[in-house]
């Protein structure tokens, strides 16, 4: 049975991860755990699950956006992507939009902020079959406005999971 499972998962699918951990901000309060969390997650994804990992530690706005575009542009229809972000987040109350704050961001200079909408747009544009986004930051809930109330959901059965594996998904 184990050989059957191993054979089933040996496909042309590739697994990519963009892992970002920002602790050391130029103009904002420094964080304690974001960088270490990113290192641990990148290590597990690479060494336990075989992901090709791009790890960005204390990345500025240009590096973060350029890497996001580079990865999402190269993905093919059977590829899978995990994006993990740990760092500061902020809400622009006037626009009611959330942002990731790279290490060169400041509250006075919003041009360095990365809009959650930019992240969502890149996820929508990529050809990857499956994309999972995990954001450990303030205002990460603004990434997906159509959030589902999981408390009222029926339990997920295996047939549903099998159907999802064959569809393009974004979580």
Model feature map: region roles:
Residues 1-9:
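Compositionally biased, proline/threonine/alanine/serine-rich low-complexity intrinsically disordered stretches
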Residues 7-8, 14, 52, 59-86, ...:
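Caspase-like (clan CD) cysteine peptidase catalytic core
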Residues 17-26, 46-51:
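Acidic/histidine-rich, surface-exposed loop or edge segments in extracytoplasmic proteins
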Residues 17-19, 53-56, 161-163, 169-171:
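Conserved beta-strand scaffold positions in the cores of enzyme catalytic domains, especially
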Residues 24-39:
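Glycine- and acidic-residue-enriched helix-capping/strand-helix junction motifs
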Residues 26-30, 54, 108-110:
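A generic structural signal for short coil/turn motifs at secondary-structure boundaries
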Residues 45, 131-171:
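Active-site-proximal C-terminal subdomain of hydrolase catalytic domains
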């Amino acid at each position: 049975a184990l050989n059957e499972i191993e054979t089933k998962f040996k496909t042309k699918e590739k697994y990519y991860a963009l892992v970002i951990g920002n602790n050391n901000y130029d103009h904002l309060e420094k964080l304690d755990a974001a960088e270490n969390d990113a290192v641990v997650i990148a290590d597990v994804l690479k060494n336990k699950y075989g992901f090709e990992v791009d790890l960005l530690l204390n990345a500025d706005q240009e590096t973060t956006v350029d890497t996001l575009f580079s990865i999402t542009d190269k993905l093919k229809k059977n590829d899978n992507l995990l994006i993990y972000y740990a760092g500061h987040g902020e809400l622009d109350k006037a626009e009611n939009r959330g942002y990731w704050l790279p290490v060169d961001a400041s509250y006075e200079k919003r041009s360095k902020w990365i809009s959650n909408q930019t992240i969502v747009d890149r996820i929508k544009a990529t050809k990857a079959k499956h994309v999972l986004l995990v954001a450990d930051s303030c205002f990460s809930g603004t990434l997906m406005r159509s959030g589902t109330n999981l408390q009222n959901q029926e339990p997920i059965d295996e047939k549903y999971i099998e159907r999802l594996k064959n569809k393009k998904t974004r979580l």
